[in-house]
Amino acid sequence: MTHKRHALLSAIMAVAVALSSFSAQADTDILNVSYDPTRELYKDYNAVFASYWKKQTGESLNIKASHGGSGKQARAVIDGLEADVVTLALAYDVDAIAQRGLIAPNWIKRLPDNSAPYTSTIVFLVRKGNPKNIKDWNDLGKPGVEIITPNPKTSGGARWNFLAAWGYALKQPGGNEQKARELVTNIYRNVKVLDSGARGSTTTFVERGLGDVLIAWENEAYLSVKELGPDKFDIVTPSISILAEPSVAVVDKVVDKRGTRKVSTAYLEYLYSPIGQEIAARHYYRPRNKEVAARYANQFAKVKLFTIDQVFGGWEKAQKAYFADGGIFDQIIARK
C-alpha cells in the first residue's frame, strides 16, 4: 500500500513538474495594431524581437499584427480591439485613444524622440520616364494630372500628404492661406481614387495601373520600386516636404489587464536599439540613431523638411482645422 501511494505521489509530482514546465514555456501573445504600410517592417522586426525575447527570458512570444488606415485603426482600438501596443502614423491617432482612457496622457514622453522611433516624409511615385513631368507640389494641381492618394478621414498618411502640400504652398514666395487652399483644391480636383489607407492607394496605382502619380510615404515608394523594378516607376522628391513622425505607445489598459506590460514595453524600446533602427532603415524608414542614419544616408534623397509644429501648431490644431467634420478638407471635397 505504501509502495502504491509512493508511486501515485511520484506520478502526481511528475505531472505537476510537467505542467509547471509547460506553463513556463507557454506562448505569450501580444497584438501590435499598426498603420497600413508597415507590414513588411514589422514582419521582420517581430521575428527578430521574438528571438531576442526568447534568449533574454526563455519565454516564447507570438506577436500578432493588424494593419489598416491609421485613423481607422485608432477607432478600432477605441471600440474594443485589444492592442497591447499601437504603432500608428501620427501622434493625433494615439492621442485619440488616450482621450478614451486606454493610454496614459503622458505617453508621448515615455520613449525617446516623442515616442517616434523612426521618421519618413512624403514623395511622389510616377510612371517610368515621368510622362507628366511632375517635379514639385505645384505640378500636381495642373489640369490633366490624375492623382492617387488615400482619404484623410481614415488614413494617417493621407493627412501627412495634405499638410505637406499645404505647407509647401505657404513656404513659396508670397505664400499665404488663400494660395495654399487654391493649390490643394486643384490637387484634390485631380484625385482619381481616395482609398481608405496608404497600401490600398499603392495597390490602386501599382497593380491596377490607375493614375499618373501616387502621393506616398517615402518608404512605400521605395518599396514599390524595389519589389516591381526601377524599369516601371520613378520616385520624385519634392523641393519641400513634411517630417512625418509615426508614433508608438503601450496601451496601458490592455497590458495591465493581460499582464503584458513588461514585454510590450520592451517591444517598443527595442525599436530604438541599433538592431531595431537597422531594420527600420532597411525598410526605408529614416532612423533616429545617428550611426545607423549615417550608414543609410545615401539611400534617401535630400529634401527640405518642415514639422507640423512649425507650420500648423501641432496635430490637435491641424486635425480640428483641416480634417474634422466640416473642416477644410470636407469643404474642398464638397466643391470638387
Pin down the residues of each PLM region.
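Short helix-loop capping/hinge motifs at secondary-structure junctions, enriched
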Residues: 129-135, 154, 167-175, 254-261
